[in-house]
Amino acid sequence: MSDDNSVTKVAAFYQFAALPDYRELREPLRAFCAGLALKGSVLLAQEGINGTIAGAPDAIDAFAHELAHGTMFGGRLDNLELKFSTAEAMPFGRLKVRLKKEIVTLGDAAADPTRQVGTYVDAAAWNALIAAPDTLVLDTRNAFEVAMGTFEGAVDPGIKSFGQFKDFAAERLDPAKHRRIAMFCTGGIRCEKASAHLLARGFAEVYHLKGGILKYLEEVPEAQSRWRGECFVFDERVALGHGLRERDKDATRDQ
């Protein structure tokens, strides 16, 4: 049975995968999304795909099926990281499908997640990892995102863009001192690329939260959670809490 199509369903997705024909994929993907009346933003690059889109539940399900199993990508997105949530209203004004040099910009050619990444840790195992005294817990997001919410004991790199993460790592992280690093981000893409960067620099034990904060908030009960605050999202919902609940907009206006 299909979902209630009166609800707006949101899909956040990414995968690092070799897409040498990414330029040729732009128009077919745009046309497919437009035909389903989807809105949002999709990035295509030689290293993969990254995006967040919204629409009717049936349309989102058709989109997800095409990416993972359809002919457009020919099975190359068979390990797609995909997270679903809902919105009270359409959180995007239009559809954008753009070509990029990177699907998340770090600016380090040696950081290639299609070749090597850190160890994935699912939401259920995350609490134990970050509670260990010899684990450095590292938030890879921008400072304004960290200010809205983060995990207990996490280090804030104080960066304004993800491209500055490599400078933070060069100045503040030492493979000899920081033997175990656990990183996280909104949906998993930034910390996955950051893990590739640290491995290329000689860090041996690097972990990252599979599915990111959003998957953690979806799966871990609030009573067991080590997350504090809200998770910023790059759409009109602004921020999500435990259970992926939208921020109370009326309460926000009253502040």
Swiss-Prot record:
Question: In which organism is this protein found?
Answer: Bradyrhizobium diazoefficiens (strain JCM 10833 / BCRC 13528 / IAM 13628 / NBRC 14792 / USDA 110)
Which keywords describe this protein according to UniProt? Oxidoreductase, tRNA processing
Point out the coiled-coil segments of this chain.
none
Recorded hits in PANTHER family, A to Z, give:
RHODANESE-LIKE DOMAIN-CONTAINING PROTEIN 7-RELATED, THIOSULFATE SULFURTRANSFERASE/RHODANESE-LIKE DOMAIN-CONTAINING PROTEIN 2
Identify the domain of life. Answer: Bacteria
Q: What does this protein do?
A: Catalyzes oxygen-dependent 5-hydroxyuridine (ho5U) modification at position 34 in tRNAs.
* GO annotation, biological process: tRNA modification
Reactions that this protein is recorded to catalyse = uridine(34) in tRNA + AH2 + O2 = 5-hydroxyuridine(34) in tRNA + A + H2O
The EC designation for this entry is 1.14.-.-
Residues at the catalytic site: C185
* PROSITE patterns in the cross-refs: RHODANESE_3
CDD domains membership = RHOD_YceA
Protein's recorded name: tRNA uridine(34) hydroxylase
Family named by the database record: Belongs to the TrhO family.
Q: Name one GO molecular function term.
A: oxidoreductase activity, acting on paired donors, with incorporation or reduction of molecular oxygen
Instruction: Name the InterPro entries on file.
Output: Rhodanese-like_dom, Rhodanese-like_dom_sf, TrhO, TRHO_N
Residue limits of the Rhodanese domain?
131-225
